């Protein structure tokens, strides 16, 4: 009975495989939205105000960071929790594949969230005259919470690695 339960639990990790594949579909959706934004802005590029163009560019950078985050979570999560990726030797392989454990993935995700939040906060500040002060305050508080959380996670990781 014990062997059956252990084998069943170990095999259940494959339930995550479609979830990680779903992230690749989310990446496709993000890419479509990215190019939709570019197609939308190109006809208006010469009539746009510089600040509006910067807001669009920040939005594109934001989507790019989210896309990178999706790739990182998709591949690292799959390798850490499901199975190693069998990529043939003659194909290009991302140099961080197989080297990122769950803790380093968590720290990279936290750093990515801080970067994404920073871009979002910059977009909000560029339109600050149209945003109520209390809403600006909450954006800053939320961003600082992300920054503090990422810092604490990195610090705790450093402490645990140093003690082992």
From Swiss-Prot:
Membrane topology (UniProt): Multi-pass membrane protein
Keyword Transmembrane appears in the UniProt entry: yes
Pfam families hit by this protein: UPF0114
Name of the featured protein: UPF0114 protein YqhA
Chain segments annotated as transmembrane: 15-35, 53-73, 136-156
InterPro entries for this protein: UPF0114 (IPR005134), UPF0114_bac (IPR020761)
Record gene name: yqhA
GO cellular component: plasma membrane
Keywords for the protein's UniProt record, in alphabetical order: Cell membrane, Membrane, Transmembrane, Transmembrane helix
Family: Belongs to the UPF0114 family.
Location in or out of the cell: Cell membrane
Annotated organism of origin: Shigella dysenteriae serotype 1 (strain Sd197)
PANTHER family for the chain: UPF0114 PROTEIN YQHA
């Amino acid at each position: 009975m014990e062997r059956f339960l252990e084998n069943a639990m170990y095999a259940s990790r494959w339930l995550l495989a479609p979830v990680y594949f779903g992230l690749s579909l989310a990446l496709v959706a993000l890419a479509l939205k990215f190019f939709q934004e570019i197609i939308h802005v190109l006809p208006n590029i010469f009539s746009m105000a510089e600040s509006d163009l910067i807001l669009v560019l920040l939005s594109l950078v934001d989507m790019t960071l989210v896309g990178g985050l999706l790739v990182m979570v998709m591949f690292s999560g799959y390798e850490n929790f499901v199975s190693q990726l069998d990529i043939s030797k003659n194909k290009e392989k991302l140099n961080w594949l197989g080297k990122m454990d769950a803790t380093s993935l968590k720290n990279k995700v936290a750093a990515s969230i801080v970067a994404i939040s920073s871009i979002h906060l910059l977009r909000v500040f560029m339109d600050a005259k149209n945003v109520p002060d209390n809403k600006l305050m909450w954006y800053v508080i939320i961003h600082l919470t992300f920054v503090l959380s990422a810092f604490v996670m990195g610090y705790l990781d450093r402490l645990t690695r140093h003690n082992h």
